[in-house]
Regions:
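Primarily membrane-embedded glycan-assembly and transfer machineries that use lipid-linked glycans
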Residues: 1-66, 92-215, 220-228, 233, ...
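Juxtamembrane membrane-interface segments at transmembrane alpha-helix termini
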Residues: 3, 57-62, 82-83, 108-117, ...
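Membrane-embedded alpha-helical segments of multi-pass membrane proteins
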Residues: 45-50, 73-79, 100, 188, ...
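Membrane-interface alpha helices of multi-pass inner-membrane proteins
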Residues: 64-77, 82-88, 220-227
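A cytosolic-side transmembrane-helix exit/cap motif
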Residues: 66-71, 117-125, 255-264, 283-285
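Central hydrophobic cores of alpha-helical transmembrane segments
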Residues: 71, 99-104, 216-221, 240, ...
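Hydrophobic/aromatic-rich transmembrane helices and adjacent perimembrane loops
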Residues: 232-248
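Aromatic-enriched
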Residues: 245-328
Length: 328
């Protein structure tokens, strides 16, 4: 469905070779994450499906329904929270209203079963025992099972263990910093991601829809795992849309920019370095602890941004040539 929305065509009307090559490669690139998701039986595909439903309605100019679907996805898991930043940057007020409405429903719905007071107690307990008891810099989620920037900061700037191999705990500490400074670094990284989303939305707001809308959506999806404070392999099914996007741009030769292609290739290579099938358990864990996977995700986001610059520049030149043509 996402590919059909992105191209503005029915799936059956897309040339057979194109649709199968794009979807096969994108699915192959994310197969590791999908299999892990199915193995652990998590809700990440449901979250992804709700976001895609929201995007379907958004493409149909149904703003309120878009917000409600997106809001319910965030109510299940906060993974999709960066889309709030995206819609804020696009000034989609009705969508934001729908998100708030869905969030309110999700918070109050359990009250119809357990009562309002107990419902509030549950939410307070969750906030105190889960959110406040595990702050950035605590090192409690520093293992390589957590691929977020928050965990990377803990691994590099605290003495927390990075991974265990044959009963021995390994660390990759660069320098030990006070917990408060580590927390500041994590917050700054999240602000940097939010800023990047805003910059993309504002810079390319007048670009062709493939760039302004679908490129932006792919950009947000690619940064979602890094924005979250806890990101595990099953959560990475959300990378399917950005991989569909970059494979489509590459295969259909929408841009032949070498930098874009190098970034996509590096993204795949760095994420593959963390696979124990190729490098064994120890090396895969060590490379993950060093941040290879996080760098790979940043490369993917950079590739999408680079493609937007190249395609938008080419489109502006084409339009400029058309305007100047009749006068010469």
């Amino acid at each position: 469905m996402f590919y059909s929305l992105m191209t503005g065509q029915r799936f059956s009307s897309i040339p057979a070779k194109t649709r199968w090559v794009v979807l096969f490669l994108a699915t192959a690139l994310t197969a590791r994450f999908t299999l892990a998701h199915l193995r652990f039986g998590q809700t990440n595909i449901l979250v992804l499906a709700l976001v895609v439903l929201a995007l379907t309605w958004f493409s149909q100019r149904k703003a309120l329904q878009t917000g409600i679907a997106a809001g319910f996805s965030m109510s299940i898991k906060l993974t999709a929270l960066p889309f709030v930043i995206w819609f804020l940057a696009r000034r989609s007020n009705k969508v934001l209203l729908g998100i708030c409405l869905a969030g309110l429903i999700a918070i109050l719905l359990p009250a119809s079963i357990v009562g309002l007071r107990r419902n509030l107690d549950y939410h307070r307990e969750w906030f105190e025992r889960v959110v406040m008891s595990d702050p950035q810099g605590s090192g409690s989620w520093s293992g390589t099972g957590n691929l977020s920037l928050r965990a990377q900061a803990d691994r590099f700037f605290s003495t927390a263990g990075a991974f265990d191999y044959k009963g021995k705990l390994y660390r990759v500490t660069i320098i030990e910093l006070p917990k408060k400074i580590v927390r500041v670094l994590v917050i700054l990284s999240m602000l940097a991601i939010a800023t990047a989303i805003i910059v993309y939305a504002r810079r390319f707001r007048d670009a062709p829809e493939l760039i302004s809308l679908w490129g932006g959506i792919a950009f947000v999806f690619s940064l979602m795992p890094l924005f979250s404070t806890v990101t595990e392999i099953p959560h990475l099914v959300v990378l399917l849309p950005p991989y569909i996007y970059v494979v489509h741009v590459w295969y259909c030769q929408i841009t032949a920019d070498r930098t874009f292609r190098a970034l996509v290739t590096l993204s795949f290579v760095l994420s593959s370095l963390t696979t124990k099938v190729f490098f064994g358990v120890f090396l895969s864990r060590l490379l993950t602890a060093w941040g290879c996977f996080s760098i790979g995700l940043l490369m993917l986001a950079a590739a999408i941004f680079r493609a937007a610059i190249c395609i938008d520049t080419a489109e502006r030149r084409r339009l400029s040539a058309q305007r100047e043509g009749p006068l010469t």
